[in-house]
Amino acid sequence: MKVFRSHLLVCGGTGCHASGSIAVKKILVDELNKRGLSEEIKVVETGCNGFCAQGPIMVVYPEGIIYMNIRTEDVPVLVEEHFVKGRPVERLFYKEPGKEDRIPSMQEIPFFALQDLRVLRNRGLIDPENIEEYIARDGYSGMAKALTEMTPEQVVAEVLKSGLRGRGGAGFPTGLKWQFAQRSPGDVKYVLCNADEGDPGAFMDRSVLEADPHAVLEGMVIAAKAIGSKHGYIYCRAEYPLAIHRLNVALGQAREMGLLGKDILGTGFDFDIEIYQGAGAFVCGEETALMTSIEGKRGMPRPRPPFPAVAGLWAKPSVLNNVETLANIGQIILRGGEWYAGVGTEKSKGTKVFALTGDVNNVGLVEVPMGTTLGAIIYDIGGGIPGGKKFKAAQLGGPSGGCIPIQHLNASVDYEKVAELGAIMGSGGLIVMNEDKCAVDMARFFMDFCKDESCGKCTPCREGTQRMLDILTNICKGKGKEGDIELLESMATVIKDAALCGLGQTAPNPVLSTIRYFRNEYEEHIRDKKCRAAVCSALFKSPCQHTCPIGMDIPAYIALIRDNRLEDAYKVMMKTNPFPSVCGRVCDHQCQTKCRRGLLDEPVAIKFLKRYISDNASRPQVKPVGITRKEKIAVVGAGPAGLTCSRDLALRGYAVTVFEELPTPGGMLSWGIPSYRLPRTILDREIDDIRKLGVEIRCNTRVGREVPWGKVNEDFDCVYLAPGAHKSQRMGVEGEDLKGVWGGVEFLRDYNGDEEGWKSGKKSLGSRVAVIGGGNSAIDAARTALRLGAEVTILYRRLREDMPAAAEEIVAAEHEGIKIEYLIAPLCVVGSNGRATGIECLRQKLGDFDSSGRKRPVAIKGSEFTLSVDTVIAAIGQAPDLSFVPAESGVKVNKWSCFDVKDDIASQTTNAKFFAGGDAVTGPSTVIKAIAAGHGAAEDIDGWIRKKNGEPAWVPPSEEQIHIPFVVDEETVECPQAHMPELEADFRRKNFAEVELGYKKDQALKEATRCLRCDAEI
């Protein structure tokens, strides 16, 4: 045999073919010939390598170097550098998502290293059209053993011992199925391979057939020996041309070598295989429908019993297994059932191949032991979710399966656990979905698929799937009504119980599982006409506006920027947002996460454009609003929720008095967010506009102290409680009460209340500060401490990607010189003479997943260390201080120290006169959600009063009509988001000047033109 110094294994699966591997291979051969290397280096087209996301792929054997995403233009350089000069081309190595280092070796890449290959043991290693390469890797050895050394009963016993269960979906024990067929009387029996892989997102069987067809043929021969069959069929859909081609080649080679046909290996055993091409009907994946199709009839299921093992194809005993099941058989017989059962769980033995696809970085084929956790498959092997998005759920089992949500990432993926969670293993399609997927729309999609694929033979499936689809479609279109969810559940139960075959019996699974885990989304679609994923387009004008908690007309004000009408743009913003300047600086801009421009390049900088308008527009004069209502309203707390509610109620004619315990209004806007992010003049200007409407704001007035609770209750007709969450959570460690230990909120409040004292040095943090936490308050505290002259280290117990703080704030902190230490947890604060001198910490590693989808930090024993510091700032969370509420008030406080509110009136407490909102109800949240809570509370309060008085609902006055221009560039060219100008880090770290400088006119106009105007109605 000719020896080559290198074999270049080029992936030749359908996925890589689609990515251009055929052209890459051709040029590779040409370049090697051109340089006279064809006698030293051999190019081999293999089957699917498995890492479909990175194709075209080439492995250099025996070096083990793997090249990915090869383009035709890369090939000449690659040949010259690697095979002529001996310098591997690093830019074509694999790079893990979010990391810069490139990995040259295949076995160092987590996608490959963490798998356990049994079915896929030959993937990417052999030429699937060369039987000799298969034989060289123990191919047909299991078959030879079965035919020459074992009786049919021994073959069945070995398969039973292995614990192998059918990999086509049902999970029925393979050995038991074979035993039934073996014991069925009859001279004619059939072995059938189900290669009719019809699940959306599934490509396991196709890839096995393309990469290792002989493994399937070997398994079929062994099955034939076990049951006494002489003829077999592979039922493969015609839309798999490459798989069919390679099967035909494999069949021809096997016959030529005496491994198929008459007298196999001289044993006197006869068996041959025929390929039957199916038309691609999903129902033909059901075993009796598949057999009916082979018989030349329309593929429709038959009632059972009799079962196929007794009367299957042409009423003869038949065994049907899918591709993956049969591909296991050769190795089970060769190595023994105990070897196979050595991995997996007690009831689910061996490995399972998954087609990992959807919203995951490493799309491809994954083979892992049964019992591997869902999180390990998606994150450790799959590389997590692209684009910084959050995992939502995984659909397992295709249209017949169910979704497994984020709180079950630690779930063991085996037959029993998957069924317990409401899904099925299916053939192994694993579709990962991020937060941008709608659970209701997903259920509608799969029901639409099942409805189309229903054969129509039985009424429950034929009519039931159509009726369920109608209901789901109506919900997605905003036409859902109360009772629809319960009706879906009822119909699903009937269909599951009454349908003839597996298609109908499992069709309701996606609906039932999404209702089970995402019932709130169904309710939002029906009651609120809202799709939180911004998918169901009938429910909104544009994704950005729909995602904004207050529904700002974002496309409108961006269009007005483009038209240079900033005054009108400002008016549009003020319709829904009383704090546009504030939100242009500190909003968490969730709208941008749903901006469709982000699918092309980067989202439109909505937040920065909002700021541009508020910084540059002429502000309209605010005039007092007359009091037209007799009812008086008290608001407790002058934060964004309280002030928004006050403004809305004043505009409805109510007399409103706001009680604020701090010296100035604004809540966390004034007392928590530092001025380098939100200058006080900007905030004060927008609060003054609310005052001008006639809202009275009494500062330095704490309810329960300066004004008794009883007096508020007596003097006012309604009270809105919006005190915010101004109390830091304690760390719960020894030494927390030493001097020099601050809560994050308390430190920021103290600084903002006494800036001169801190700046003059009367108050000091010392030279070294440790900040504990990873949220926005932690970053704010750290950057404030830095500006006061300290050397600052942030200690966070997880990784950077887990930090709740805004990504841009983390980057800004790092640019300013703040050090962030990850996987660190505080053990205790150490001190001397009653003052903190250090913090003892423990290093962490990541364990399993918590309910939020983040990995839990686990302590590393013996990793303790002490960090010498002068001050410790604990910013690990906040809670409301509701101590001002008397126990006898009738206002209930829940176990999270937040107000309890009713379901039917979203902001009404357990005392009907008292309403509540903002952080005091939800816990620490965002500015824009607090504003939304204020809007909602004003509507609830006004509605409750009017209903009590027997009055009609409030009708808002007619608004000024503002013409919104519609201009969209005919050709959309990729263009990144405009960069926000900032003060230089070395300068800004020494003062509290505003860091972000705002867009200039040309920047704003250019950014505004990037808007795709998703609000357009066609």
Over which residues does each language-model region extend?
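Rossmann-like dinucleotide-binding cores of NAD(P)H-dependent redox enzymes
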Residues: 655-698, 782-828, 951-965
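Glycine-rich dinucleotide-binding loop and its adjacent helix/turn
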Residues: 612-626, 685-705, 728-788, 893-910
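FAD-site-proximal beta/loop scaffold in flavoenzymes
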Residues: 737-767, 849-924, 963-969
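N-terminal Rossmann-like FAD-binding beta1-loop-alpha1 element of flavoenzymes
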Residues: 631-657, 778-786
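A conserved FAD-binding loop/helix module that cradles the flavin
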Residues: 781, 920-948
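Feature captures the FAD/FMN-dependent oxidoreductase FAD-binding
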Residues: 627, 632-636, 684-733, 828-840, ...
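Hydrophobic alpha-helical positions that pack around
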Residues: 244-370, 382
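Ferredoxin-type iron-sulfur electron-transfer modules in oxidoreductases and energy-metabolism complexes
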Residues: 1-7, 21-45, 62-91, 142-159, ...
